[in-house]
A protein has these predicted regions:
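N-terminal hydrophobic or amphipathic helices/low-complexity stretches enriched
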Residues: 1-23, 35-38, 80
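Homeobox/homeodomain signature
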Residues: 3-4, 9, 47, 64-67, ...
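Active-site metal-coordination/substrate-binding segment of hydrolases
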Residues: 67-90
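A non-catalytic alpha/beta surface segment that caps or lines the substrate-entry region
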Residues: 19-65, 88-90
Length: 90
């Protein structure tokens, strides 16, 4: 199994302006990383009337238990006025 550099990955993830419902490519990016680690992946899009679709990434490794489930999010809080930042928040 390839080695994962967590700090490098965190820096790469932070660069995505993934403000819901726009994922800015972060789902495909993470899906590619997980596939390289041997995960089977699927991006599922949830649609609800009067709302923009939201994507979720489902990844599975192995076949037998015991099982571990991680639920998290890839979106960020809107940065507000970019002129108020001394550096690009992404």
């Amino acid at each position: 199994m390839p080695i994962l550099n967590e700090i490098k990955l965190a820096k790469e993830l932070i660069r995505f302006p993934s403000i819901t419902p726009v994922d800015a490519g972060i789902m495909k990016f993470l899906e590619k990383k997980l596939k390289k680690l041997g995960f089977k992946t699927k991006i599922i899009e949830f649609k609800e009337k009067n709302f923009k679709p939201v994507k979720n990434l489902y990844a599975k490794l192995g076949r037998k238990g015991p099982n571990f489930c991680y639920a998290g999010h890839l979106d960020v809080v809107p940065p507000g006025n970019l002129n108020d930042w001394t550096v690009n928040p992404f």
